[in-house]
Amino acid sequence: MLDSLSRRSFLSTTAAALGATALGAAPPVPPGKSRPVIVASANGLRTMDKMMELIRAGVDPLDAAIAGVAVVEADPLDRTVGYGGIPNEEGVVELDAAVMHGPTHSGGAVASIRNIMHPAAVARLVMKRTDHCLLVGEGALKFARMHGFPEVDLLTDDSRKIWLYWKETNSRDDDRFPPSADEMDPLVKEFFGPKYVREHGTIHCSVLDTHGDLGCTTTTSGLFYKIPGRVGDSPILGAGLYLDNEVGSAGSTGRGEANLLNLSSHTIVEAMRRGMAPKDAALEACKRVAATNRLPRLRDAKGRPNFGVNFYALSKDGK
C-alpha cells in the first residue's frame, strides 16, 4: 500500500482515510442537549441509522455502539470481523474485541475467543460482571458460555475455501497442490486477484450521545492466517481503542503491532486533551508510528513504512 509513498504522503493519505470513514450526526437537538455523533470505520456505515435511532431513544452510547457492530459481526460477507472472518493458519477463527464506557471510565475485552459470534458483547460483560479488563482464550469462552452465549462454527465455507487456497500455496516444500486455474472457485480467484493484500481487518465505532457521554468498541477476527493465539491491538485498551469522557474517543485499524507499540488510541486522546483537533491528534499518532518504525522488514528501500494504519477520533464537543 505504501510502496510509492513518502513519509509525508503516508501521513496525508492516512488523514484522507479519516475523512473517508463513516460519520453520522443527528439533526439539531433541544437546548441543553449535545448533538449525537457516531464515528466508525467504513464497514460500520450501514449500521449508522440503527445506532442513531438507539441514541435518540436514550440508549447508553456503548450499548448503541455494540448493537451497531453486532450487525457486522454476524455478516458472513465481512471477512474481517466475527462470523465468516478469515481464520488463523490452522483454519480456526479467533476473535478479539474491546469496549470502553465513558461515564464510568471502565472497559473490558476478550482475545483469542473461539466459537462466539459477538465478542464485543462478551467484552461488555467482562467490564460489567467481573473485576477484570481482559479475558483470553479458553477462559473467555467459558465466561461467554456461562452468560448464555451460544457456540457456533465461525468458519463459513467461503472463508474455508480462501484459507485452504492460502494453505496450498503457502509453501513449495510441502505436499499440497492448489487447484488448476480452470478448477479454482470464482470466489477464491477474485479474493486472490491483483489487488489482494493480507489484511488486518477490523471495525471500530465511537459514539457521543445527547448527554455528552462517550462509548466505543473495536472488534475483529484479526490478521489473516495469523499464528494461533496472536493478539493484535483491537482488544488492548489504549492501543485498539481508548476514551476519556472529558476529552474524546479514539480507535484504530490496520497493522495491530504498530498500534500496540505506540499505544496509538491513547496517544490520540492525550493529544486531544492538550487541545489538538481530532484530525491533528490522529496525525500525531501517524507521525509517532512512522518515527518509531525502525525494523528493516517493515520499511521499503527508502526507509518508508510498508504497511497501513487508520485512526478514528471523536472529541467531546462532537468534532
Kindly label every feature range from the protein language model.
Residues 2, 12-19, 27-319:
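Alpha/propeptide regions of enzymes that mature by internal proteolysis
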